[in-house]
């Protein structure tokens, strides 16, 4: 007995489109990013975060420190706030200390203490004065704090037994920090713009 297969049962793959507006692969990428805990990708999306809603302004000092990045970043934030946007500044320090509390003030400057007790960089005092806004621990982080949180998550099994690496896990925690701040905003509304100042040198 011959079993015939009709030509219509075989589908030929659709060739890739040259149209830049074709979104054939965007759904696949989106679903992969959101299911990141089950793949080698890790790009956490915190509650309240809306993709495409928040904008980011990054302020770097390249190979020099003490250029006035804090004044510049807070001035940009003030101008945006005066235009009616909700802004959320964050200072990201490259050092491995958990916070600024134990740093030598002669080398680093005076420590600024936020209302919630966070010991941080003086630039956060500039942000608070310029924006007339009380900041929290969400507005300050260091490499040491990020590494500490990565290791704590690994000990709790949050990475599902995978080998923890710089990419995607450490970079994923940086994304988490920025996205959580974007969702939190000024404490009342989510941020339209997140101002990211990267301290020190890159």
Regions picked out by a protein language model, each given a short descriptive name:
Residues 1-202:
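Flexible phosphate-sensing "switch/lid" loops adjacent to ATP/NTP-binding sites
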């Amino acid at each position: 007995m011959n079993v015939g297969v009709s030509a219509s049962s075989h589908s030929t793959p659709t060739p890739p489109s040259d149209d830049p507006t074709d979104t054939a692969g965007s759904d696949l990428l989106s679903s992969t990013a959101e299911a990141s805990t089950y793949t080698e990708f890790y790009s956490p999306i915190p509650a309240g975060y809306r993709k495409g809603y928040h904008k980011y302004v990054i302020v770097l000092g390249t190979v020099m420190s003490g250029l006035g990045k804090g004044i510049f970043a807070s001035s940009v934030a003030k101008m945006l706030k005066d235009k009616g946007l909700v802004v959320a500044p964050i200072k990201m320090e490259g050092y491995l200390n958990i916070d600024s509390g134990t740093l030598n003030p002669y080398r680093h400057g005076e420590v600024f203490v936020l209302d919630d007790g966070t010991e941080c960089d003086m630039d956060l005092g500039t942000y608070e004065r310029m924006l007339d806004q009380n900041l929290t621990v969400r507005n300050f982080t260091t490499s040491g704090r990020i590494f500490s949180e990565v290791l704590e998550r690994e000990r709790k099994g949050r990475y599902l037994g995978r080998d923890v690496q710089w990419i995607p896990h450490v970079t994923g925690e940086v994304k988490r920090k920025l996205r959580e701040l974007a969702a939190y905003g000024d404490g009342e509304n989510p941020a339209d713009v997140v101002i990211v100042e990267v301290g020190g040198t890159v």
